[in-house]
């Protein structure tokens, strides 16, 4: 757990009168704990508390190989995960809730909580902290940008050959990033030739580059993220 970052979030909570904060966004949980998890449809929650008694709720199918320095509550698919969260909030007054948390979990927690408990949108507590980058983060962002420049140069050269389709070029992007020290794509890359190439979220096809075509490339690499 990154205690310095957690303390900043706790300060934000205190300023807004929240005694607990439910965080469900995996990237925010990773930012605060260093634990990277992709839960899919299963409930995954970090519950921060002003008293320092923090708890993470994990499905028993998740893999954990590090000491997170907090309480861990494990549940199975056959168990009522949100009820476990509600139990941890039985004495809560004001609970901040992640803007990305699914209603199917939140509604169950609200149903089981005490009548005096108030739920508020609480993501701003984490968002404010993440907006202000630490020096190490700035260094990583600069390096990620440098690597992306090198990667896109290679992609431009692939496109310039003229014998590769949009899909064929797109499929090589992840390998290019990995060769430069990145873990892969940060999102699905877009390579678009010619007319309508600037359409939002274009999906590549078997189009080949023709003389006079414009080329749209939208790509990014994941570097120590």
Indicate where each model-derived feature is located:
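Generic secondary-structure signature for well-ordered alpha-helical cores
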Residues: 114, 143-153, 157-161, 174-182, ...
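A composition/biophysics-driven feature that prefers long, compositionally simple stretches
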Residues: 1-150
